[in-house]
Each structure stands twice: as C-alpha cells, then as structure tokens.
Amino acid sequence: MSYPQEVNKRRTFAIISHPDAGKTTITEKVLLYGNAIQTAGSVKGKGSSQHAKSDWMEMEKQRGISITTSVMQFPYNNCLVNLLDTPGHEDFSEDTYRTLTAVDSCLMVIDSAKGVEERTIKLMEVTRLRDTPILTFMNKLDRDIRDPMELLDEVESILKIRCAPITWPIGCGKLFKGVYHLAKDEMYLYKSGQGSTIQEIQIVKGLDNPELDVMVGDDLANQLREELELVQGASNEFDHQAFINGELTPVFFGTALGNFGVDHFLDGLTEWAPKPQARVADIRTVESAEQKFSGFVFKIQANMDPKHRDRVAFMRVVSGKYEKGMKLKHVRLGKEVVISDALIFMAGDRSQAEQAYAGDIIGLHNHGTIQIGDTFTQGENLKFIGIPNFAPELFRRIRLKDPLKQKQLLKGLIQLSEEGAVQVFRPLINNDLIVGAVGVLQFDVVVSRLKSEYNVEAIYETVNVATARWVECTDAKKFEEFKRKNEQNLALDGGDNLTYIAPTMVNLNLAIERYPDVVFFKTREH
C-alpha cells in the first residue's frame, strides 16, 4: 500500500465523558468490534479477575476507573483506528488535556439518564481550542432516560454545538426495542443479555413497514413515527463540513453495556472523521502527507511493565513513516538517536513496531532523556507547539516515613512529574518537597505509586501555598532584584524552571503589581 493510502486509512480519536457515563465499557465494546479482544470484560466485577482491558494500573484495577491514558489500535471497515483512552473519573490530570492534542476527532459519551455533566463541559472546552470534530453517543438506553429531544437541546445550548441525529431510539429502559437509522430508513432491533458478544441484529426496512408494529407493538411504533416527524422537522441534517469544523455533531443512541449501537458510531467515525491532520510547529505547519518523519511526545508513562522499571514516552506520528532502526533527531537536545525498539499498543499488550505512519501512536523507551512536548524529526529543527502544562490548583508538602529514603523520593517524584502525573516544586529556602496537582485523586495516585514502584512510604501535610506561576523576565538586573526580594516564595519545578509559589491570591496579585517587568505564567508550553 502506498504512503498516502496508509495515512488516509488511519483514524485517531479519544473518548470524552463525565465519570461513569460508560466510557470504559464503550472502549471494551469498540475493541470487541475491532476483533482485538474476544469477550469484553465487565468493569468493576466483584472479585473477578476480568479487568477492563484499558484499565491496567494497580490503583485503577482496585477502583474500576481509568486513571492513565492507554492507546489501542484495531482495524475496522478497512481503516486502522487508534483509540486513545483518557481518564474519566472526576479527578483527572493534565494528561487528559494533552491526550486531546494528539487526536483528530473525539467521541463524546453522554449518560442519557443524566444529560450533559460538568466534566463533559470541561473536556469540550479543550476540544474547542483546536475545533476537534465530535461524534456523540447517547448511552444507557437500556435504562430509563430523559426525553431524547431534551437531550439534544441540552447539548446544543450548553456545549454550543449543533446536533444531527443519525439514529433515534425506539423506547427506553425495559421497553427499549432498538433504534431507527434516519438516513438508511431502517430499524435495528435490540435483544438484551448479549453484551459481551457481537449479536446478529434484526433489521426492519422502512418506517411504514407493518412488520415494525408486529415487532415492537403498535404503541411504540406509532410513538416512533410521531417523534420522527418532529425530529425531521426540527433538527439539523448531517453536514460533513460543519462536522469537520467542529460546529455540528452526529448523534447516535444505544447501550454500550448491551453492546448495541456501538457499530453505528464506528461506521460514522470511519466514514466521516478526518484522516491524520496537519500540526502547527514553531516555524511552519507540518502536513501528514509529508514523507519525512516528525512526531511529538504527549505523555510519559512510568512502569508499564512492573517486571522492568521502564518508562515509555508516547509519541504521535505527525508525518512520514517510522521504520525500525531509523535515525531521528531529538530536537530539544540536538542529538541524533537510533530508535530500534519503538512499541505499538493494544491496551496493555505491547509489541515491537516494525513501522508506523502519520496518525499512529508509538512508544519510545525513555531513560530520563525524553520530556513531554519533545519533538523528533528526520533532521529538521522544528518544535510542535500547543502541548500545555497547567499551574496546579492544589498543593501538599510530602514527607517521608523513613528519612533515609530522600534520594528515592526525589527520583520518584521527578519521574512522576515528567510523565505529567503531578508537578513537584522545591523551594529555594529549604529542603521541602511540595507536590502540586490539578485534582485531589492525583495525590493518592502519587503516594500509592511511590510505594509500589519506588518502595517509598510517604505522607502528606498541608502547606501554605494557594497557587503557583512560572516567572520570566527579559531584564536580568530586575529579575535578580525580584529573586533576591522574593526568595521565600520561589521554587524550582521538576524541570528546574523558576516558579513563584504564592500563599494567597492576594499575595500573587501584589507581586504582579510590584514587578511589572516580570511575567507570571499560568500555563507553560512543554
């Protein structure tokens, strides 16, 4: 297959949702359709060893939530689909934001009993920054749901994106009978209790087909016809260009648990979602059709293989083709490196990548030299931009139970900060270690990983820090004066960048007023 054909058949997407909307279940079912796993493991099984395929870290296995981002590749409809799993529990980290910089489209999953929830709103704001095309799956139709028209209105008014229903539900809860496909004028009938296999779907052609009344009953059949008259009059038609621009979302209804409707959005994804897109770098825009290799690292994951203390850097291939043993330039370090052992992933199962194309995600073994945001090329000096680092909102001082393990603690924290799990600050005036996070769960994750991966027992104490900002100044003399007078509020982060740690917002605002030449940054590009 030629290079353009290889690139054009790739689809790289992530699933975004509020916790418990069914994202992990959908991930399972998607892999089932891609023949990647034989039976879909049910999440949160009581004492069962069947963990969902994408939740692979110890703490995730205990809690039944996906904390870290995994990558899964599978074939579907003559396409090669890369699914990036993002943490869905309510305390997610910047990892999630950064993963969204590595995809070309997203599937938004909504719990139809609840509608649009807070985390979905936050994640949609992130996709807006790049106008990412969005498909929508209204999940959990096997339960009692809100009125489908209401759900569409809510998405339109809160998320400011037009909805174009592609399928429409026939009943819900115990009366859920299937969906009607608006464009194909076909009904797909649902049978319960077949969630872990791909079921033979019974199809009824034509909305006026009397067979429909026999299959679902007169009441539901008439209700469906009435609803569809309204829907076809009041809702948007699917417009491919508006979808690509991120202005309109095709909406599918179904139940992930019952494994019904998942193939409908997969068909939509492979047919409509964009092939690998161009990416903006500091000096130019890089097109996916370019033959020379380029890619950027959007996440680092420590200890994916508990037997080896390894760290893997996940890289999105932007252009060109990776081949085993090729020589690449690590632009930030200005060094040529030979990459002979890159990995491709099938959620927890990894294998050596012989080759990879634009749109694919590969893993590089990282011995501490690769950072989030690093660019690799075939020699060109360019850096991909737009991979954010956020100022944390929560802070704790971390203390050892065994003071002799200070070295392991620092090593563990620096590694965890490099992979974006938390940020670490070392105040200039003492030997404290302050951990900053975007959400509370990250603190638990760090303590449990320090223990299981670095054999360090640590506890947290409160610390008088309200917020942090990275500081820079072009006037060296004024910067020195600023540093001298504010030493008690200055710290170095994991990458040795100078940071102002403020005990209160008032303190920060005063500092900003007093030192107009110093710039205080809330986010930092990697």
Curated annotation (Swiss-Prot):
Descriptive protein name: Peptide chain release factor 3
Pfam families reported in the protein's UniProt record: EF-G_D2, GTP_EFTU, RF3_C
Keyword Cell inner membrane: no
A GO CC term assigned to this protein in UniProt: cytosol
Primary role: Increases the formation of ribosomal termination complexes and stimulates activities of RF-1 and RF-2. It binds guanine nucleotides and has strong preference for UGA stop codons. It may interact directly with the ribosome. The stimulation of RF-1 and RF-2 is significantly reduced by GTP and GDP, but not by GMP.
Cellular location(s): Cytoplasm
Domain tr-type G: 8-277
Principal localisation: cytoplasm
Alphabetized InterPro entries for the sequence: EF-G-like_DII (IPR053905), EFG_III/V (IPR035647), G_TR_CS (IPR031157), P-loop_NTPase (IPR027417), PrfC (IPR004548), RF3_C (IPR032090), RF3_dom_3_sf (IPR038467), RF3_GTP-bd (IPR041732)
One BP annotation, GO: regulation of translational termination
GO MF: GTP binding; GTPase activity; guanosine tetraphosphate binding; translation release factor activity, codon nonspecific; translation release factor activity, codon specific
Keyword GTP-binding annotated: yes
Entry's family note: Belongs to the TRAFAC class translation factor GTPase superfamily. Classic translation factor GTPase family. PrfC subfamily.
Amino-acid positions noted as binding GTP in the UniProt annotation, renumbered to this chain: 17-24, 85-89, 139-142
Record keywords, A-Z: Cytoplasm, GTP-binding, Nucleotide-binding, Protein biosynthesis
